Amino acid sequence: MTTYTPMMQQYLQVKEDYKDAFLFFRLGDFYEMFFEDAINASQILEITLTSRDAGAKERIPMCGVPHHSAKNYIETLVQKGYKVAICEQTEDPKQAKGVVKREVVQLITPGTIMEGKTLEGKSNHFIGAAEQLDDTTFGYAYLDLSTGEAVASSIEGDGKALLMQMQAYGIRELIVTDSLQLLLAEHAANAAIVLSVEADEMTMDKAASYVEAVPPALQISCLRLLAYIDKTQMRSLSHIQAFTFNEMKHYLRIDSSSKRNLELIQSIRGGDQKGTLLWLLDDTVTAMGGRKLKQWLHQPLATRSAIESRLAIVTDLLEEYFVRTELQTALKQVYDLERLAGRVAFGNVGGRDLAQLRDSLRQVPAIQQQLMGAGKETLQQIGVALDTCTDVVELLAKAITDNPPITIKEGDVIRDGYHGRLDELRYAARNGKDWIAQLEQEERLKTGIKNLKIGYNRIFGYYIEITKSNIHLADLTRYERKQTLANAERYITQELKEKEALILNAEEESLALEYNLFVEIRDALKEFIPRVQALAASISELDVLLSFASISEKYRFTKPQFHNGRALEIIEGRHPVVEKMLNKQMYVPNDCVLEEQNNMMLITGPNMSGKSTYMRQVALIVVMAQMGCYVPAEKAKLPITDQIFTRIGAADDLAAGQSTFMVEMLESQHAIMHATKNSLMLFDEIGRGTSTYDGMSLAQSMMEYIHDKIGANTLFSTHYHELTALEKDLPRLQNVHVAATEKNGMVVFLHKVKKGAADKSYGIHVAQLAQLPEEILARARVLLENFEAGNEVVAEAQKIAEPPLQMSLFTEEEPMAPAEAEVLKKLEKVNILGTSPMQAMNILYELQQELLNMKK
């Protein structure tokens, strides 16, 4: 059995409890790692791998990082999905008997990191927990440790839908049970979410106040999340707020796939924010406001009174230009109050953080004054509700210097005059050299020795040096010999000894006292955290509403009107993002009118004509309106929409083994199963991923089902011109087309939506724009003429047909067996649109087994 040194035994004992984390083991000024941790960390962090003697026959692998720069290394590991356990020395090495006591003081995980570049200002950093409630429902909770925000909700769907929802919210780490981890594991990597297992739950006696507003079924996720936070952070976190319950009926629900298709927060192309609705709407000037805007985008409102309340504030801000500009000027001076409050509670706040808190709170009276003086009741109500936190400002103004350093260890954080003893120590430390110089001059005058000097070294401290030729001039009764040199003697006096102790200890004692005073101030601030958080919430909402007002003015947006019916009327509507991207080019506006008895629209027209843009435009106007923002239209009279479903331009989900057509069918199934008459449904070219007749049949049957069974406001684009005939059979269906024309043999897209069906597809013209070879285009024109002449078969090939590359699987002459015909009948009876993906797979498996058994 290998015998290690006591220190290494201590390391191994600690490591046993943190097997899934890198253990940063404090040794002096370094955090050291050993064994596998050292090997792996040296590769990931690109630091030198060395070794050390640990009492065994062979040296063990070791690497380390300086404690003062450890944050950067920790952040790198956490960003890559690893966990880091911080093991500190918990006693003074000078007082230790044997091995210095050490213990883990924090476990930093992907969801709990509290500082560094990972915490991007305008984005939340959420950690979540989920629990499977039944076969189709998951309860979940999430919180941002850096701000204290905490939310609980639920979602219907499978494990992939849950993870897509978590990914949409930006959740970095999801706490699950062992069984749920198995269910989610295959999708977690694609979603870039770390799954962490936690079996324990915080007891209700500790957590009751956190979950009062949460339904009992969802509380288990909250309790498990709190237990994990408590276990990893190992400190009181007074800034974590009570969980709010997001009851879905109060919000416009948009599934993660539709959010992606509409490019609300991330663009489909680059995955960044440019070209998204968030990019357009974000004129916020605070980090808090940026995060709040993103939250509102994720969950627009679905309660008319709440929407109209926001719109009323935006209207008043638009009418008060000078108030608006003064408010934004003041808000630009406000730092991230939510995260500053979080750092106070967490205990990692610095002097500069407290200065930022003080300077931010100093802006609140000016903000309040502007709101109260605006002459608008809505703005005055906001102003009255603001807490200026005067007592916090007074404490920080009295205690903290104007420009403190980043870390408390550098000193000069506490203001002079705040504490008498600290002032004395600082005076001694700052003026020690002056006192020494003055004493030296006094001793020269007393003794008459012109070359008498006072010096200092680390061994003997301060001393008075007199050359041997002048010793007879000194009053040796006042001097005590300290050191003898070849040509001089060194002495000390009682006064010098006392001053030496004061000078040498003053700086060290000053820093220690300053740190203790800083901790007292930090702890005193904890009782103000709820007030600062409430203020931050008000300021963040004001920032977003100011952003809505400035954007609405800049882009000539219009105030939407809401009613309790289902009709949707948008006059001269525009796609806000496309319009901005076009810069000075003219954007062609379009109407969209869906009446109560005519609320399905079938859109035809050539590729590149703007069908998809038109459909997205309608959805974005609904989203913006229900966020409480003005919209890009001359007029918008809208119903309250409960859900938006989109099937527009999905990319192949190859990683999940799903083709474009399969994704199309799954998303269509989800929409049809969950939509209500109050929903908005957008379908772009359904059925294009399969054969013409299959696709056309699916598209028609879906339109009929939505028309007859659901009744939702629906936009349905297609290349199947045959479907336009359905206008005669479906009373609520109207045909429209995106106009195009020919000029000099070239297609010109007018981007104008007009009533009626398109009379031409212009597919070959689009191919010409793409500069396909003329030989191909010419042949296509010939084939098109044949098809349009009514030929039912493919035009005769110009070359002799080659034998098929693949033999047919079936011969037409072979009759179908009765048992096979029975399987076909069963297949025909399956309601595909009313079947979940898992049920469909089971049915398919059963039918396949029946066919295979026939051949045995």
Curated annotation (Swiss-Prot):
Keywords: ATP-binding, DNA damage, DNA repair, DNA-binding, Nucleotide-binding. One of its GO terms (biological process) is mismatch repair. GO terms for molecular function: ATP binding; ATP-dependent DNA damage sensor activity; damaged DNA binding; mismatched DNA binding. InterPro entries: DNA_mismatch_repair_MutS, DNA_mismatch_repair_MutS-lik_N, DNA_mismatch_repair_MutS/MSH, DNA_mismatch_repair_MutS_C, DNA_mismatch_repair_MutS_clamp, DNA_mismatch_repair_MutS_core, DNA_mismatch_repair_MutS_N, DNA_mismatch_repair_MutS_sf. It holds the Pfam family MutS_II. It comes from the Bacteria. Belongs to the DNA mismatch repair MutS family. PANTHER family: DNA MISMATCH REPAIR PROTEIN MSH1, MITOCHONDRIAL, DNA MISMATCH REPAIR PROTEIN MUTS FAMILY MEMBER. NCBIfam families: mutS1 (TIGR01070), PRK05399.1 (NF003810). This protein is involved in the repair of mismatches in DNA. It is possible that it carries out the mismatch recognition step. This protein has a weak ATPase activity. This is DNA mismatch repair protein MutS. It comes from Lysinibacillus sphaericus (strain C3-41).
